From Swiss-Prot:
Protein name in the entry: Adenylate kinase
Keywords: ATP-binding, Cytoplasm, Kinase, Nucleotide biosynthesis, Nucleotide-binding, Transferase
Subunit description: Monomer.
Chain positions recorded as AMP binding sites: 31, 36, 57-59, 85-88, 92, 161, 172
Source organism: Streptomyces coelicolor (strain ATCC BAA-471 / A3(2) / M145)
CDD domains, sorted: ADK (cd01428)
């Protein structure tokens, strides 16, 4: 299956993408991973992307699309893939359609993870990360540490990342509504969108997504 996963920041896209990709035995292709891999391997595309990022500019669509194309042409993606973070706008969605068409392929489904805005803000703004090990993540409401401000695992100081402040989260949501949300209508016109409630236990959200994919087959 060839799937696109969309949803606002904090809807749990990364978590669900990993779980769905494992269940469906297809690679999880995230734009964040693509950028990191190309930059660390110093590919031509990676060098190009880094030059834009270092200048404080957005990486042009054609660079992102070229990276996605390279990844989708890898042998492990022959049987399908799950795209997370791409396409990010309508022009990228159109480019993806053209790309797939030239290969004689098409998307099977677009999963739209929906979560109320206040819930998204609460999820992200409540995150606290360990200064010693960024993988040690807690939440002031859902998974609080035993001692406030102290990592349960290593005793390191817990802090709120700048990206996780309420003001920054609301700005990111604004960008999502303006740039990314229009692709949902674009894909709805092709009959590809399944809306998934991204609230409740993680397992339940995964179950809803898999059920929606079964209905679309």
């Amino acid at each position: 299956m060839r799937i696109v996963l969309v949803g606002p920041p904090g809807a749990g896209k990364g978590t669900q993408a990993t779980r769905l990709a494992e269940t469906l035995h297809i690679p999880h292709i995230s734009t964040g991973d693509l950028f990191r891999a190309n930059i660390s391997q110093q590919t031509e595309l990676g060098k190009l992307a880094k030059s834009y990022m270092n200048a404080g500019n957005l990486v042009p669509d054609e660079v992102t699309i070229a990276m996605a194309k390279d990844r989708m042409e890898q042998p492990d993606a022959e049987g399908g893939f799950l795209l997370d973070g791409f396409p990010r706008n309508v022009s990228q969605a159109e480019a993806l359609d053209e790309l797939l068409e030239t290969e004689g392929m098409k998307l099977d489904a677009v999963l739209d993870l929906e979560a109320p805005e206040d819930e998204v803000v609460k999820r992200i703004a409540g995150r606290r990360v360990c200064r010693n090990e960024p993988k040690h993540v807690f939440h002031v409401t859902y998974t609080p540490p035993k001692k406030e401000g102290v990592c349960d695992v290593c005793g390191g100081e817990l802090y709120q990342r700048d990206d996780d402040s309420e003001e920054t989260v609301r700005k990111r949501l604004e960008v999502y509504h303006t740039q990314t949300e229009p692709i949902i209508d674009y894909y709805k016109s092709q009959g590809l969108v399944a809306t998934i409630a991204a609230t409740g236990p993680v397992d339940e959200v995964t179950r809803r997504a898999l059920e929606a994919l079964k209905r679309d087959q």
